[in-house]
Structure formats: C-alpha cells, structure tokens
Amino acid sequence: MKFFSSLTALLLSLATLGAAQAQPLRVGVTPGSLADSAQIAAREAKAQGLDVQIVEFTDWTLPNTALVNRDLDLNYYQHQAFLDTFNRENRQDLRAVAVGSRGNIGIFSKRYKSLASLPTGASVALANDTSNQARAIATLRDAGLVTLRANAPQLAQIDDIASNPKKLKFIEVAGPQLARALDDADITVVSLGGLLQAGQLETARQGLYYSVGTDAFWAIHFVTRADNVKDARVRQFIDIYQQSQAVRQQIHASYANESRFYSLPWLK
C-alpha cells in the first residue's frame, strides 16, 4: 500500500512539474526596440522548444508590479537605477539577472539649433521619476549646462544642482510622455528610443547633445523575482537573446540603423 501511495505522490509531482514546464515563459517589455527584439528571440526560442509569451506595457511601473504578482516570469524594460528605486520604494527584492541593450539619451529641441543659443530662462523637460531624472541631470551636467553640489548622490535630482548659469526652468514629465514635451519645452532630455517610438527620427538625428557610452548601469536589464533566478527557462531565453544575430539586427533597425543611438554592453 505504501508503494502505491509513494507512486501516486511521485506521479502527481511529475504531473505538476510537467504542467509548470508547459506554461509559456511570460516576458514583460515596453514598445519599441525592446519589444521588437524580444519578439525575435521568442521566435527563435520556439524553434528550440521554449514557448515564450511577450507582453507589452506602456506604463513604466506595471511590468514590475506584474512580476511581483507572478503574472510575469521576467521583464526587460528597466535599467539598474530604476530597479533599485522600485525595490527600495516598494520593499521588494526583484533581481537583475543579465544585461541587455543600452539606449543612449540626449538633449533635443525643435526651437534651437545649439546649446549656445539657448536663452536665459529656457525651459527643460525631463523625467519625473528618480532614476531617469538622475540620468537627465547627469546629461545636463556633462553638457555644461549645470553643476552639482559636491556631495550630490549618484542619482542626483533637480535639488542637487549647485549652479544653473542660464537659469533653466525645469518641467518634470512622466517618462513615456517626454517625446511629446518637445512641443512645449525649449529643450527636452529624452532617450533616443523614446524619440523613435514617437516617430521623431529627424529630431533624434539633430540632437544638441548626445550622452553615449557602453557602461551597464544605464543598460536595460533582464529582471525576475528572487525565487525565480534559477529558472532554466529564464537563462535559456537570455542566452538566445544575447547570442542571436537576428536580435542584434533588429535592435540596429529599431534604432534607425544609427549605431550612435545605442550599444550592446554584453559584448564588451
């Protein structure tokens, strides 16, 4: 009798495991180069026996919320600073498990042709969330428009500005809406990906300043829950993404075939 009980338990366990493995790997992304390249990787994964469901979000918080709620197994849309801020503010422990593409950002304008021509009191649109505002402030600093106080944190905010010679006026905007702010502000600090997603290719090519690099901190990361880090499907999908020539070609195409608009830090 014990043998049959043990056999039944084993069969139930195997059935449960099989059902879990039969579920698709659910990956949350945002539209544009991330979604397009993830779809390519998903098709290649399918050919290798891994079923992947790509779920698109236009909100910058929902992919993490969905991951916490187990509606996703993995997301691919945020850099390390954004993840750190989310974990701190929401008392979560989401983990970055691999690095993806790094979209560059810059300073753009529909009203002025150079930073030197900016008038005193010019308006600047930048992200209102902590991590992306920090990247914008760093870009303004590197462009020579502002300086920061000596003890400013890595994620410096507007309040950390020490000098502002042109008396720039800051307009804080939700990240997904930054490309639209080009019509309302004198200059906008926005990602190249955001501009391209909004159909602003010519504006993207005529930046007043570009912040480029290959460091992984501002790259987009693959993120999962702490209890899901060892999921073999997650590792398999990431390996496919990083090794696929078709994925790299799609990223290049998504960035209008402009190598200066992005980098692939995992190739360093």
Each model region followed by its residue ranges:
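Bacterial N-terminal signal peptides
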Residues: 7-16
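Short, polar/charged alpha-helical segment
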Residues: 28-53
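Periplasmic-binding protein-like
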Residues: 99-108, 134-141, 199-268
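Short helix-initiation/N-cap motifs at beta->coil->alpha
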Residues: 55-65, 152-180
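A conserved helix-loop-strand patch within extracytoplasmic ligand-binding domains
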Residues: 97-147, 248
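Ligand-binding "clamshell"
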Residues: 85-97, 110-112, 184, 189, ...
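Beta->alpha turn/N-cap motifs
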Residues: 32, 56-60, 70, 74-84, ...
